[in-house]
């Protein structure tokens, strides 16, 4: 049986670490002038994929 192909868009969006999957924040592409500096600072940091979505992301990444 051939190996499963990973979803290339998912590979670009997620990074796999030690037992966790990191993701970037949304709401940072445009219309940034009305967003406060504190919110922009918080959006800069990377987050972890929520436990309810881990299984789906792992399937996309071929893990």
UniProtKB/Swiss-Prot annotation:
It comes from the Bacteria. Keywords: Ribonucleoprotein, Ribosomal protein. GO terms for biological process: translation. The keyword Ribonucleoprotein applies. SUPFAM superfamilies: L35p-like. The keyword Protease does not apply. InterPro entries: Ribosomal_bL35, Ribosomal_bL35-like, Ribosomal_bL35_CS, Ribosomal_bL35_sf. One of its GO terms (cellular component) is cytosolic large ribosomal subunit. GO terms for molecular function: structural constituent of ribosome. HAMAP family: Ribosomal_bL35. Belongs to the bacterial ribosomal protein bL35 family. PANTHER family: 54S RIBOSOMAL PROTEIN BL35M (PTHR33343), LARGE RIBOSOMAL SUBUNIT PROTEIN BL35M (PTHR33343:SF1). This is Large ribosomal subunit protein bL35. It comes from Campylobacter lari (strain RM2100 / D67 / ATCC BAA-1060). The lineage of its organism: Bacteria, Pseudomonadati, Campylobacterota, Epsilonproteobacteria, Campylobacterales.
